[in-house]
């Protein structure tokens, strides 16, 4: 089951998923995703393009979950960069290193996901210091505090306004990007992800042995 692993107790990738399945902290655990902060990191030697980056595979055919129509509606006339395997729209990065460079060279990362527990590209972009503009669906409000480490809304006009603001205000984009990186380092790093899983597995084994 997506977002749910049964190993003696219920484990979820976010509080959003846990609540959606009708569970609580009393009978479940949350193990949040993590990314490698030593790999996904800013490069101060790379200038950032003043454009809105999005990274999505098969985007037009996944409008229901990835918000392709919302993206079209909100970026009209704005400078954009799109990567991902979407024939007729965009090509994927040639390698993981290339994808990292794409994040590192982008001022703004724009995420329009409508139904996604944890968009991994969002975490990667945050780790690379991009200023985030995103919808406020599923787990995203657990990751992004609006105005502190990104800008989130489900209102198309407000999302477009956020993009326009960051295109004009490089200092604000830098501040939000730095705070986004800090969030990943402190809460969504790979080491913490592995440690949390190990602790959960050890706890489950010990509870089983004591029964």
Tell where the protein language model's regions lie, with residue ranges:
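Conserved catalytic-core segment of nucleotide-activated headgroup transferases in glycan assembly
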Residues: 20-23, 36-90
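Short alpha-helical segment that forms part of, or immediately flanks, the ligand-binding pocket
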Residues: 100, 119-127, 141-142, 148
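Short alpha-helical donor nucleotide-sugar binding micro-motif in glycosyltransferases
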Residues: 101-106
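A short alpha->beta transition loop at the rim of the catalytic pocket in nucleotide-sugar-dependent
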Residues: 107, 129
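Aromatic "clamp/platform" in nucleotide-sugar-dependent glycosyltransferases that forms part
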Residues: 114
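Short hydrophobic beta-strand element within catalytic cores of glycosyltransferases
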Residues: 131-134
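Conserved acidic donor-binding segment of nucleotide-sugar-dependent glycosyltransferases
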Residues: 146-157, 165-170
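A short, well-ordered alpha-helix in the C-terminal region of glycosyltransferases
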Residues: 165, 172-187, 193-199
């Amino acid at each position: 089951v997506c977002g749910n692993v049964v190993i003696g107790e219920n484990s979820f990738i976010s509080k959003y998923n846990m609540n959606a399945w009708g569970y609580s902290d009393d009978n479940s655990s949350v193990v949040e995703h993590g990314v490698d902060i030593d790999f996904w990191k800013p490069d101060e030697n790379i200038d950032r393009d003043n454009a809105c980056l999005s990274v999505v595979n098969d985007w037009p055919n996944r409008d229901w979950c990835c918000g392709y129509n919302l993206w079209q509606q909100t970026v009209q006339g704005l400078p954009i960069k799109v990567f991902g395997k979407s024939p007729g729209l965009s090509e994927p990065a040639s390698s993981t290193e290339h994808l990292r460079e794409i994040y590192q060279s982008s001022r703004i990362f724009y995420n329009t996901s409508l139904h996604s527990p944890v968009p991994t590209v969002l975490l990667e972009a945050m780790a690379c210091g991009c200023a985030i503009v995103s919808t406020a669906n599923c787990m995203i409000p657990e990751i992004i505090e609006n105005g502190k480490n990104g800008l989130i809304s489900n209102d198309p006009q407000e999302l477009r306004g956020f993009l326009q603001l960051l295109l004009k205000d490089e200092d604000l984009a830098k501040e939000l990007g730095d705070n986004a990186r800090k969030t990943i380092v402190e809460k969504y790093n790979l080491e913490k992800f592995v440690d949390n899983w190990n602790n959960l597995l050890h706890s489950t084994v010990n509870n089983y042995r004591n029964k």
